[in-house]
Amino acid sequence: MRQTIAFLFFLLMPLTIQAQAEREIIPVDWKEVKKVAEQDPQRIKDLVARLSANKIDTTMTWQERILAFYGQSYLESNDDTGEGVMDLDKLMNEKKYEECLSAAKKVLNKNPLSLKALRHAAFSIGYMVKDSTHHYDVTISEGQVYYNRMNRIFNTIATTGDGSKEHPFYVTSVSDEYMFMRYYLDLWEISKQYATDNCDIIELKETSKYYSQKLIYFEITRVMERWKSMFE
């Protein structure tokens, strides 16, 4: 069953999809990002704080947003195997929404830009708000905070490419690929997935009004780096 943001957050605005023609594509310069992470990690931490603030910082450039999100992967684990992240799906599937929200907040305390934790926090609140049989101490405005932050990250990923072979979307984890496809581009059905060179290629069974091509490319340089580091 598709769990779209618009369905679950019936009081919230739908995701802000930026038309490709309206923005410049800015590929991630991994060498530069890693250099900043090693030589000036506080700069990335400051940018992460700005990107994850409750109120959007309209002075941030796209380059700063990119440095914040992708640079964070060098400072903290923000993939789908990090501490506490693995528990989120289990708690959500068991409909333990209060516990899921609490677990998501713990992940976000370490990495405020974890897409998976933001998704679970937002959806947990959405389910609790809609549940008329229980009184939960949460409000739709709290869910909006997580929703807004998630949307900023999606827009940041969207700025790095257009999904083509020439301009793939850059990600730091496989989980981010599926989060981006489902909750930003409304792409749910895939035929197969395979990797070549530095890209994951996903063949789609169906397209959406946000993405009309049958193939979508994700640049996975950082994903491969992290996998290799697990075996070193």
Feature locations, PLM:
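Bacterial Sec-dependent N-terminal signal peptides
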Residues: 1-25
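Hydrophobic transmembrane signal anchors and adjacent membrane-proximal interface regions, especially
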Residues: 3, 19, 28, 138-140, ...
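Short, flexible active-site-proximal loops enriched in glycine and acidic residues
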Residues: 14, 114-118, 156-160
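N-terminal alpha-helical interaction modules that lie
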Residues: 20-103, 164-232
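Alpha-helical protein-protein interaction scaffolds
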Residues: 64-153
